[in-house]
From Swiss-Prot:
This is Phosphoglycerate kinase. Its EC number is 2.7.2.3. Monomer. GO terms for biological process: gluconeogenesis; glycolytic process. Pfam families: PGK. It catalyses: (2R)-3-phosphoglycerate + ATP = (2R)-3-phospho-glyceroyl phosphate + ADP. Substrate binds at D26, F27, N28, R41, H64, L65, G66, R67, R124, R161. The keyword RNA-binding does not apply. HAMAP family: Phosphoglyc_kinase (MF_00145). One of its GO terms (cellular component) is cytosol. It comes from Mesomycoplasma hyopneumoniae (strain 232) (Mycoplasma hyopneumoniae). Keywords: ATP-binding, Cytoplasm, Glycolysis, Kinase, Nucleotide-binding, Transferase. It is an enzyme of class 2 (transferase). Its main location: cytoplasm.
Length: 404
């Protein structure tokens, strides 16, 4: 089976000379105390930006930054700081307009010379107008499309959503294609969905089954084993009749959890023991030495325990393809990051294994351990990655032009 994105136009198929190019990127960067704390998303877009500029395009960049709920959000969510950082990284002048529609925008675009870059204001500023951006308002999409000759979508992180600045523009513009980052992400994920080397193992963490039920169900069909850790493991354990103490669980997902264990008894590998604490805090871990599989009433599970680390190590040792999404404990607490760190090391040390990691907290954990280069691919899009694994396609790809 061939993924549908292979039929879509790619940035290398486009002649950019003297054309005004609308580029949708994902500059949704973390900002702390008025400073950008990670430039990874900016760096990820550079190959596409340079391709357009170096080939004589007049570049207009669109991106969102956070969510906009009221006018009070606007000053904190301006893309000005990102435009300034992009100028610093590229070593060239970047024009910025604190608007994204209207005469000032049109005038600035009309004055662009080939090789120049203009960054428009946060697309979600339009959400103050009846959620026009997030609800893919047709008039807004048509307007943004009217500003350029070509549309390139390189915002992988938003491809699972139909917004005015992705689906809207692509629907109404004459020429469109996907950028380098989008193709790189889709190529990496396609390897494990459509043609994984086996054994193919998945590790799924995070707090809630409800957030990941789609991907868990899909992976139980596609993978050879699915290893479950994180907070969601306690829902599975309670469903099987184990005592879980004060641990979080989803009451309305107990039946579902039990049915998955019954349907996939050999594929679904659940955490055995846990590192425990009397409250949700970064305390010295406790362990139930008498009965590691159960959690006393006054304690809650905060991380996978040593038995589970060894269990996971044993299952993963012959893996040829591994997907990991979600931390296996409360990794932001130093005392409960051990499980996530140990599993990261296990995967990093596997030979001839194609490994993909996604999810912000999981990625932060491997970066903290200096293991980023030991993974085959680090995905930039959490929700988009999950949606593509579940469906083999993404809504944002739909209106992108087909290859000739």
């Amino acid at each position: 089976m061939q993924p549908t994105y292979k039929n879509k136009k790619f940035i290398d198929d486009i002649d950019f000379l003297n054309k005004t190019v609308i580029l949708r990127v994902d500059f949704n960067v973390p900002i702390k105390n008025g400073e950008i704390s990670s430039i990874k998303r900016i760096i990820a877009s550079l190959k596409t930006i340079k391709k357009i500029v170096n080939n004589g395009g007049k570049l207009v960049i669109l991106s969102h930054l956070g969510r906009i709920k009221s006018k009070e959000d606007l000053p904190k969510k301006s893309l000005r700081i990102v435009a300034e950082k992009l100028a610093e990284i590229l070593g060239q002048e970047i024009k910025f307009i604190p608007e994204n529609r209207g005469p000032k925008v049109e005038n600035a675009i009309s004055q662009l010379e080939k090789g120049e870059i203009l960054v428009l204001e946060n697309t979600r500023f339009q959400d103050l107008n009846n959620k026009a951006e997030s609800k893919n308002d047709a008039e807004l999409g048509r307007y943004w499309a009217s500003l350029g000759d070509v549309f390139i979508n390189d915002a992988f992180g938003t491809l699972h959503r139909a917004h005015g600045s992705n689906v809207g523009i692509a629907t109404y513009i004459k020429e469109s294609a996907i950028g380098y980052l989008v193709k790189e992400e889709l190529d990496a994920l396609s390897k494990l969905i459509f043609s994984p080397q086996r054994p193919f193992y998945a590790i799924i963490g995070g707090a809630k089954i409800s957030d990941k039920i789609g991907i868990i169900s899909t992976l139980l069909e596609k993978a050879d084993k699915v290893l479950i850790g994180g907070g969601m493991a306690y829902t599975f354990k309670k469903a099987l009749g184990y005592k879980i103490g004060l641990s979080i669980y989803e009451d309305d997902k107990l039946e579902l959890a039990a049915s998955l264990v019954k349907k996939y008894p050999d594929k679904l590998i659940l955490a055995l023991d846990a590192a425990l604490a009397p409250e949700f805090a970064d305390l010295e871990p406790l362990y139930n030495q008498e009965n590691p599989l159960e959690i006393p009433d006054h304690l809650e599970g905060m991380d996978i325990g040593p038995l589970t680390i060894e269990l996971f190590k044993d299952h993963l040792k012959d893996g040829k393809t591994i997907l990991w999404n979600g931390t296996l404990g409360v990794a932001e607490f130093k005392n409960f990051a051990r499980g996530t760190k140990e599993v990261a090391k296990i995967i990093a040390n596997l030979k001839e294994c194609y490994s993909i990691i996604g999810g912000g907290d999981s990625i932060a954990a491997i970066e903290a351990e200096g293991l980023s280069n030991s993974f085959s691919h680090i995905s930039t899009g959490g929700g988009a990655s999950i949606s593509f694994i579940e469906n083999g396609d993404l809504i944002g790809l739909g209106p992108i032009q087909e290859k000739d």
